Regions:
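Membrane-interface "cap" regions at the ends of multi-pass membrane proteins
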Residues: 1-44, 48-53, 59, 65-70, ...
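Transmembrane alpha-helical segments of multi-pass small-molecule transport proteins
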Residues: 58-60, 127-154, 170-173, 342-349, ...
Length: 452
């Protein structure tokens, strides 16, 4: 314990958090944030974008994220403190790089709740089309906003229950799906085409689909924020990141492969946003469709969205408290002791964003991925600059070659993002750069605290 305390103090912070999390706790935390059934919500978009090679898109996405996970593991060993890519960029490169990386991740924080609401609302609208999509959106946003203001939080035990239920639903779908394939339902037969189809393969198209598929992997990096609470030593966080990524990657590939075999004609989806539920109905009937829809609504629209909304509201509260945003956002509810103004602002932003992207899940996912992928580029550069540039490391494989490969892969995926996501992303980046200049001119702190 003393050794761990010393390591943290070397970074300039006092060890104040209890080190109680095991490797398994860290891994479950990563699985909860990545959501093992994440492809349920974006399957149709990825399938159409990859010309039916949806399993390949997830495989490439997993490989890309593994190299990024290796860089996370390397930096978490060097800086075992609560934080993430923005902390590593700040310490590995400089304060300005850390600010920009944090600003880019902030884009994710703002847009992720909206995506979760859109996916969940689309799922429920598919089974109750009489209720307009906007009604479902308002309902999800209202429920989560009230819960977050009152202050009810999901505990670690609740997270474990949710992950178990998700895995049960996933197992049911895979088993029923495999039986449907064996029976030749909908003309299904076993083939490797979801992994590679020479007649349809186009690297550009597949990488475009990967740029959306990687959304399902976002969340593994959240494990890094628990570095100060891990009792497994420096390597525990890095190992948990890599293992959870591999586990969820395999689950993504299996479920999308089965789905692609049941409905091989990816061009005939009535609505790509709800394609997975139609496939579930073909495989097992209406009950399986309902089961996958409810699982998506609970996992995306309640569990994940509640945490995501709470996270961004506390970031806004923290920045307002540090005088980087209007002071009103730092107001705390007198009874519930929660940042209620920030929480309501997040709800308003989510409502505006969801209204604009209501039937454009793929585009919304790409906007989110712009922030994440660009921040990951900073991460890989941080490893090289810190270890090779500052520490003069001779371990070129770990500190130069691997992060360089990761940089190239992520850059290629980033290049294949759609035009809208790049336009919105660069506008956000430009605002961040101007804001950084203003902070420097007024000699104010440029750190963005995302750990509140």
């Amino acid at each position: 314990m003393q050794k761990n305390n010393g390591v943290v103090s070397e970074t300039g912070y006092k060890q104040e958090l209890k080190r109680s999390l095991t490797f398994w706790d860290l891994m479950i935390y990563g699985l909860v944030f990545m959501v093992p059934i994440a492809p349920f919500g974006i399957y149709g978009v990825v399938a159409q974008g990859s010309n039916g090679m949806v399993a390949l898109a997830y495989l490439i996405g997993m490989v890309a994220m593994i190299f990024t996970a290796l860089s996370y593991a390397t930096m978490s060993e060097a800086f075992p403190i609560a934080g993430s890519v923005y902390s590593y960029a700040q310490r590995g490169i400089n304060d300005s790089a850390g600010f920009i990386a944090g600003w880019l991740i902030l884009l994710d924080y703002i847009f992720v709740p909206a995506l979760l609401y859109v996916v969940s609302a689309a799922a429920l609208h598919d089974i109750v089309p009489e209720i307009p999509l906007i009604v479902w959106l308002v309902l999800f946003i209202a429920i989560n906003t009230v819960i977050n203001i009152i202050g009810i939080e999901f505990t670690a035990r609740a997270n474990k229950i949710i992950i178990v239920l998700e895995l049960i639903v996933l197992a049911i779908f895979v088993v029923v799906g495999v039986l449907a394939i064996v029976q030749g339902v909908n003309g299904a037969e076993f083939t490797f085409k979801p992994l590679y189809d020479p007649n349809e393969f186009s690297l550009g198209l597949v990488m475009g689909a990967v740029s959306i598929a990687v959304l399902s992997f976002l969340g593994f990096d959240a494990i890094a924020t628990l570095a100060e609470e891990s009792k497994g030593g420096k390597k525990a966080v890095g190992n948990a990141i890599i293992v959870s990524l591999l586990v969820v990657g395999v689950l993504f590939i299996i479920q999308t492969w089965v789905a692609a075999l049941i409905w091989p004609d990816y061009t005939s989806f009535e609505n790509a946003d709800v394609a997975f539920y139609q496939i579930a109905e073909i495989a097992g009937g209406a009950w399986l469709k309902w089961l996958t829809i409810i699982a998506t609504a609970v996992a995306w629209g309640i569990a994940d969205a509640l945490v995501a909304q709470a996270a961004i509201s506390r970031v806004l509260y923290s920045m307002a408290r540090d005088r980087k945003l209007p002071k009103i956002l730092a107001k705390v509810h007198p009874k519930f002791k929660t940042p209620y103004i920030s929480t309501m602002l997040v709800a308003i932003i989510s409502l505006i964003v969801t209204s604009f992207f209501a039937n454009r899940i793929g585009e919304l996912a790409s906007v989110i991925n712009f922030g994440a992928l660009t921040a990951f580029l900073f991460l890989h550069v941080s490893v090289i600059v810190y270890f090779i540039g500052k520490k003069k490391s001779k371990n070129y494989m770990k500190h130069l070659i691997l992060p360089a490969i990761g940089f190239v892969i992520i850059a290629f995926v980033w290049y294949n993002l759609d035009a809208l996501s790049k336009q919105l992303g660069f506008i956000w980046l430009g605002i961040g750069i101007v804001y950084l200049i203003v902070l420097k001119m007024t000699k104010r702190d440029t750190r963005i605290n995302l750990d509140e």
